[in-house]
């Protein structure tokens, strides 16, 4: 016997009522899975900043982070070499609104470099760039930035005996700070390319956005990044 139309309609409504919460849960789960790498990078960036603030060799960094117009953070900058060398890592860029003092949502980038000449070894580093000038901010927002060419970079003062009064090359657009372990004596970022990862920003914010959309126009938000921005404010307030 075939059920009559009213019974069929009620059955369909019941099925839809039961399915909608399940579909909503599945959609949320898939969204979390889709941006898992991006969320991990934001979390790692917060940890890197926390590591820098706790490092006794980063006195100057702690004393001057409030002067930065922007921060570029790479939690894992890997370098390896056997005659020829290559280095790279993913990072985030955030900038400060000069009027309100509020920090932007993170834009996603990759940083990479190649080197030549005899070299051997491997190294993992944490990198933070203090962006000191508007030129540095604007160049990064273009999404394809080369350190030393599109903006000047200098090595920031590092060491337990370095006081906040020590003056580095403040004419540079960016100051680089590196915490490294490995067989290399040091890490040079001169010539490294910083390229926006628009597909990562899309995954994190759920729609296509450029670095300018994120950092300047502030068209998107992701509550997950609140912990990173809170860590930046904590760093500034502790001064």
Task: Give the location of each predicted region.
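Small-residue-enriched, tightly packed secondary-structure blocks
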Residues: 34-239
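Generic cytosolic/nucleocytoplasmic N-terminal low-complexity/intrinsically disordered segments
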Residues: 14-16, 49
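Bacterial N-terminal signal peptides
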Residues: 16-27
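Intrinsically disordered, low-complexity regions
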Residues: 5-6, 28, 55, 207
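Boundary at the C-terminal end of the N-terminal hydrophobic targeting segment
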Residues: 29-33
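N-terminal secretory signal peptides that target proteins for export/translocation
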Residues: 1-11
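Hydrophobic alpha-helical segments, especially transmembrane helices
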Residues: 10-14, 76
């Amino acid at each position: 016997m075939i059920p009559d139309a009213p019974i069929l309609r009620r059955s369909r409504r019941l099925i839809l009522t039961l399915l909608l919460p399940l579909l909503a849960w599945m959609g949320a789960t898939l969204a979390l899975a889709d941006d898992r790498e991006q969320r991990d990078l934001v979390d790692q960036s917060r940890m890197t900043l926390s590591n820098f603030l706790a490092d006794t060799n980063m006195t100057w960094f702690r004393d001057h982070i409030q002067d930065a117009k922007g921060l570029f953070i790479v939690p894992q900058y890997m370098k390896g070499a056997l005659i020829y060398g290559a280095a790279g890592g993913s990072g985030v860029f955030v900038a400060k609104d000069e009027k309100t003092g509020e920090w932007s949502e993170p834009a996603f980038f990759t940083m990479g470099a190649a080197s030549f000449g005899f070299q051997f070894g491997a190294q993992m580093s944490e990198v933070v760039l203090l962006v000191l000038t508007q030129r540095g901010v604007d160049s990064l927002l273009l999404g394809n930035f080369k350190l030393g060419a599109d903006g000047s970079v200098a090595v920031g003062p590092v060491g337990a005996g370095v006081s906040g009064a020590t003056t580095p090359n403040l004419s540079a657009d960016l100051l680089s700070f590196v915490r490294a372990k490995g067989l290399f004596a040091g890490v040079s970022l001169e010539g490294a390319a910083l390229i926006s990862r628009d597909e990562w920003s899309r995954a994190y914010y759920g729609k296509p956005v450029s670095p300018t959309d994120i950092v300047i126009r502030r068209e998107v938000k992701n509550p997950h990044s609140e912990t990173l921005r809170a860590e930046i404010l904590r760093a500034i307030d502790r001064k």
